[in-house]
Amino acid sequence: MAAAGSATRRVGFVGAGRMAGAIAQGLIRAGKVEAQRIVASAPTDRNLCHFQALGCQTTHSNQEVLQSCLLVIFATKPHILPAVVAEVAPVVTAEHILVSVAAGVSLSTLEELLPPNTRVLRVLPNLPCVVQEGAIVMARGRHVGSSETKLLQHLLEACGRCEEVPEAYVDIHTGLSGSGVAFVCAFSEALAEGAIKMGMPSSLAHRIAAQTLLGTAKMLLHEGQHPAQLRSDVCTPGGTTIYGLHALEQGGLRAATMSAVEAATCRARELSRK
């Protein structure tokens, strides 16, 4: 479907938590979908308040969302998603495109719960979607074509960078980018605390640390450089940076970070098998 067509499409959300709200807000801010053409459901009004403030329609009926919208994003907790999908299955049609953002629930599980040939995709966003700077991957089910994939990618680019991947990469993305937000925060905190130790005020140190991460990330993305090249560019013989990098290597930063991604990925795979 052409990009222009997505502006008039109705988008539904089953589940109205923080991630659902972030995606909806991104769609609205980017002009991808008009607020009044978004319908969200949740058991209580607590989470729906954010959608109502955005100008979206809300309901307590999950089936009503599917009866109103052909593109529906399931943003419930993973452990209740199978029950929710089974609940709405009677109103699913061949026209629906269903998207799950729940970690640990496979495409095959979703397809088994839905009518034959239902078009299903998995999307794994991360927390920076809240500020429209998310890292998002999506994997398509057996009955999804390139047009549906392009439509969803076009919409989700309102929330950050969106890449299509094989489903096998989804758990790795959880370890790299979902959990990676916490890893980066831990490094940012340590970076700032090093400056605090040397005498810089706390608030200033944390602002500069965050800005350093932001600026570095933009250089890596916009210039397409490998991190090793940028790291080398910053180093001068006998300078401050190479001394600092030596200290990081002595502390095992590189190995510890790789192990963190591995551990988080293995845990994601373990949860997927339950």
Curated annotation (Swiss-Prot):
It comes from the Eukaryota. Keywords: Acetylation, Amino-acid biosynthesis, Cytoplasm, NADP, Oxidoreductase, Proline biosynthesis. Pfam families: F420_oxidored, P5CR_dimer. The keyword Transcription does not apply. It is found in: Cytoplasm. One of its GO terms (molecular function) is pyrroline-5-carboxylate reductase activity. It catalyses: L-proline + NADP(+) = (S)-1-pyrroline-5-carboxylate + NADPH + 2 H(+); L-proline + NAD(+) = (S)-1-pyrroline-5-carboxylate + NADH + 2 H(+). Pathway: Amino-acid biosynthesis; L-proline biosynthesis; L-proline from L-glutamate 5-semialdehyde: step 1/1. The keyword Phosphoprotein does not apply. The modification N-acetylalanine is found at residue 2. GO terms for cellular component: cytosol. Its EC number is 1.5.1.2. One of its GO terms (biological process) is L-proline biosynthetic process. HAMAP family: P5C_reductase. Belongs to the pyrroline-5-carboxylate reductase family. Oxidoreductase that catalyzes the last step in proline biosynthesis, which corresponds to the reduction of pyrroline-5-carboxylate (P5C) to L-proline using NAD(P)H. Proline is synthesized from either glutamate or ornithine; both are converted to P5C, and then to proline via pyrroline-5-carboxylate reductases (PYCRs). PYCR3 is exclusively linked to the biosynthesis of proline from ornithine. Homodecamer; composed of 5 homodimers. This is Pyrroline-5-carboxylate reductase 3. It comes from Macaca fascicularis (Crab-eating macaque).
